[in-house]
Structure formats: structure tokens, C-alpha cells
Amino acid sequence: MSFRTIDYSISGVLAVSLLLLSISFLFGAGPNTISDTFSFYGLTEWVPVATLGIVFGFALMVAAGLVILQQCKIVPAAWPLTLVAIISLFTLLTLFAENRWISAHGGFPVIGSGQGIIKYFALVPIALFLYCRHHINTRPLVWANYLPVALVLAWIGGMKFLELEAKAIVPLVETSPFMSWMYDLFSVQEASNIIGAYDLLMAGLLGIGIWFNQRILIGVASLGCLAVFVMTQSFLFTASGAFSDMSLLGGLGQFVIKDLWFIANIMVMASLTLESSPPESLESAVA
């Protein structure tokens, strides 16, 4: 697969996810998400939450448009890179808010609504690959895209060993044609433990493969990680709450659609580590 095809694929994944989120927020989705995010900056005291949702939705839509326009060489790379970085940083800083953590379980590192926020770590590495790889050596770029994948798999995977998370995923697992069988063989907690252990194992194997430059291990672990995020996309069609008649994506849909970003991260890593020869842009960067 050529890097031009990879660029188009990753840009498409990024643009589609941003567009779906933007439409949802423009139509009033996730008022609690908007309130929790903007209250960190004190903006909800001055501007109605509904208006802030429209502003955030508009920013996401502009970002999606810039991603597409840059692929058509209509706008410079700095435009989508800058806006994606701003959106990512704006949301990630709210992890310092107490309401991102479950206070009943001691707060940090027991993550609550922050599970959806840590996914924004994936955006900047994707943008760096699309718009800055001429200026970045291959290995740092691979690690930059690995870290968000490892973070979400390790953190959310680790949460699977807690009772509250095991119960929280029951509506997802029991309606999935690919995973519901687990409850026939294991208890709710045992099934959650297995899922969590799988997440941790795949994240660890991928990191080891990258560290030691073992292409076979990278390939196997990448497929293992990819399976996690492809599986979560299936929840859009099997679990309730993924879509809304009023705002396109419901709460679950907004959470799940962001996993497309990790699929893009994995595509970046695979393209940089599994190609038989580096692309010209990377060769020039190393030189």
C-alpha cells in the first residue's frame, strides 16, 4: 500500500470521526460532556451550555473540513495541524478536573468521564504523521502513535478488573454477537478480567515489538490491538444508546466513534514499521 493511499485512508478516518462528532454536538448531543469540559475554564458561567455545544461542534466541523481540504492541497498543513492540536489540548487539560475521576473510589487513577477524554491523546500523533513527517524521524513518530494506544488499552483495560467497570460493560458485551458467549462460560467479573488482560497483553506486546524492532511481533500485536477497536465500532450497531434521533450520535456513540482515532494510530505504526523500505519523505527526514 502506497503512502498516498495511507494518507487518504487516515485522513478519511479522521475527517469522518470529527464530522460525526461535530454534527452531534451541533444538534445538542452530550450537554453533560460540554458542561464538564467548558466548566473547567469557567465558561459555563457566562455562556449557555447549548451555545458552547454549538461552538465546539463548529470547531470539530472546521477541523474535519481542513483535513479534507489539506488532502486536496487547498490549505496549508499548518491549518489542520494547529486546530487539531488546539482541540486536543483544550479537552485534555480538563483531566485536571475532579469530575473526570470517580471520587467514590478515591479519584485518580480510577477514571470516570475521563475515559472519553484520554482518547484525545490520539489526535496530535495522527496529525504529526499527516502533516509533519518530513521533519520527524521515523522512530519517534512510531512511539508517538503507540503511546495513545497503549495508554487507553492499559488504563481502560486496567479498569476492567474493577467491579464497577465489569458491570458497566455488561450492556455492551451481552448484546455483542462476538462477545456475548463469554457470559455463558464466565461470570461478569471473570469475563471483564479476561477482556482487561487481553488489552494489557496486546499493548505490552506491541511496545516490545517496537522496542526491539520485531516486525512479526509488531504485525501480530497490531492486529490484536486493531481487533479491540474494530470490536468497539461494532457496538454502534449492537448496543442501545449509540445513536440518537435528535443528535445523530448518542452518549455511547460519541464515546465509541473516537476509537477510530486509535485505528488511525495503528495504521500509522504499521505503515512506518512494516513497510519493506521507508518512504522518501522519511528517508529525507532521517538524512
Regions found by a protein language model. Give the residues of each.
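Membrane-interface extramembranous regions
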Residues: 1-287
